[in-house]
């Protein structure tokens, strides 16, 4: 239903005789029932919230159109937020007789979304198609690649110390910068079982719920942006080092989620959030510390520099900038967000600088690059 159709219906029913552009919430609720307009339970709750945000308990036509068509602009979301005290605080927790999958969807809603209105919106509108295939596919591909190289080299821990491992066409190496695919494909290779296990666990525990809520397009964009930023940052700041592992993408997802939790601390309803926040920060810091130790104090003799840790840090920066913008724009068009264009411009500027650096700076600076394996 568009605005003109709604206006025609209201005029036919003489629900706004003075043509104010507003209609009472109770009056519109009666219109919904009499004409069977497509409003599910969460939209009816939002209708109450919209009415609460208005001193006279009325709603403007455009907000009603947004409500019916499921479009959520920034102004629409602000109006909902102003009146959301009318909603029960823990409404979804009291839903009886849910299936196992629906209980999981409810769990995801409380883990990821900071607002009761958003949680209800997601819970009632969630569909199983398309499924969250991106994070699961990436994790499966990483495990398959690891098993193939582990079986071939008969080495499962610290694989990068094997001379044949770094010859893989997937690894990013500064001597192979012209092979542009390596700036992304290094995410399928890992130092060993310890790094793969850490990344796979976070991708499934955090990445899959984020993908369920925000969709495959946004989460895949964030993950790949973190991966690309990781290799490009290494090519600028640690010019002699190769890179392996999906840590750039993992840290982009985790940093975005943690930043979103912190900025919406009061609204998040996940249990033990302080303890879990501390545990997540300790684990992420420990992984960075392990990567720094392997880079500068390798425990085994190696034929060249070991993988850099800068991809972790670059991914975290992408997460708290681009990622936070994405997560805070749930069910809103990113192109309508001013902050999104600022972040996109900054990321594009970084890409152009990194490309220029990789094309010209190595020769101009006379960088001592180790020979490619």
Curated annotation (Swiss-Prot):
Biological process, per Gene Ontology: proteolysis
Transmembrane segments: 131-151, 196-216, 219-239, 243-263, 275-294, 307-327, 340-360
Cell compartment(s), UniProt: Membrane
GO cellular component: membrane
Gene3D superfamilies xref list: Rhomboid-like
Topological relation to the membrane, as annotated: Multi-pass membrane protein
One Pfam family it belongs to: Rhomboid
Primary site of residence: membrane
SUPFAM superfamilies: EF-hand, Rhomboid-like
List of catalytic residues: 247 (nucleophile), 312
Catalytic activity: Cleaves type-1 transmembrane domains using a catalytic dyad composed of serine and histidine that are contributed by different transmembrane domains
InterPro entries: EF-hand-dom_pair, Peptidase_S54_rhomboid_dom, Peptidase_S54_rhomboid_met, Rhomboid-like_sf, Rhomboid_IM_Serine_Proteases
The EC number(s) this enzyme carries: 3.4.21.105
Key words of the record: Hydrolase, Membrane, Protease, Serine protease, Transmembrane, Transmembrane helix
GO terms assigned for molecular function: serine-type endopeptidase activity
Record's function text: May be involved in regulated intramembrane proteolysis and the subsequent release of functional polypeptides from their membrane anchors.
Similarity section: Belongs to the peptidase S54 family.
Protein name: Rhomboid-related protein 1
Organism: Mus musculus (Mouse)
């Amino acid at each position: 239903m568009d605005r003109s159709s709604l206006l025609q219906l209201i005029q036919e029913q003489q629900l706004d005789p003075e043509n104010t552009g507003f209609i009472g919430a109770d009056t519109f609720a009666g219109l919904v029932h009499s004409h069977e307009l497509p409003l599910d339970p969460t939209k009816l709750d939002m209708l109450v919230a919209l009415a609460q945000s208005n001193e006279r308990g009325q709603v403007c036509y455009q907000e009603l159109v947004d409500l019916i068509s499921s479009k959520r602009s920034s102004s629409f979301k602000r109006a909902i937020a102003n009146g959301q005290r009318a909603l029960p605080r823990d409404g979804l927790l009291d839903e009886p007789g849910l299936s196992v999958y629906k209980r999981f969807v409810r769990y995801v809603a409380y883990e990821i979304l900071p607002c009761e209105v958003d949680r209800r919106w997601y819970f009632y509108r969630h569909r199983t198609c398309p499924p969250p295939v991106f994070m699961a596919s990436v994790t499966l591909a990483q495990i398959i690649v690891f098993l193939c190289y582990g079986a071939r080299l008969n080495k499962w821990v610290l694989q990068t110390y094997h001379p044949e491992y770094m010859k893989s066409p997937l690894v990013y190496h500064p001597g192979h910068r012209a092979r542009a695919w390596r700036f992304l494909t290094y995410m399928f290779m890992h130092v060993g079982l310890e790094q793969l296990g850490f990344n796979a666990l976070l991708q499934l525990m955090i990445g899959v719920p984020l993908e369920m809520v925000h969709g495959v397009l946004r989460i895949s964009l964030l993950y790949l942006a973190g991966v690309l930023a990781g290799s490009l940052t290494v090519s600028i700041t640690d010019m002699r080092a190769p890179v392996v592992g999906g840590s750039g993408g993992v840290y982009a997802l985790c940093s975005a989620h943690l930043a979103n939790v912190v900025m919406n601390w009061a609204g998040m309803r996940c249990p033990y959030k302080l303890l879990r926040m501390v545990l997540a920060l300790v684990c992420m810091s420990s992984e960075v510390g392990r990567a720094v130790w392997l880079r500068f104090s390798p425990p085994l003799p190696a034929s060249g520099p070991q993988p850099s840790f800068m991809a972790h840090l670059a991914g975290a920066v992408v997460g708290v900038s681009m990622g936070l913008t994405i997560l805070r724009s749930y069910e809103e068009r990113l192109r309508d967000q001013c902050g999104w264009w600022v972040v996109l411009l900054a990321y594009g500027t970084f890409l152009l600088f990194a490309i220029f650096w990789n094309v010209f700076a190595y020769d101009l600076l006379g960088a001592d690059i180790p020979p490619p394996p």
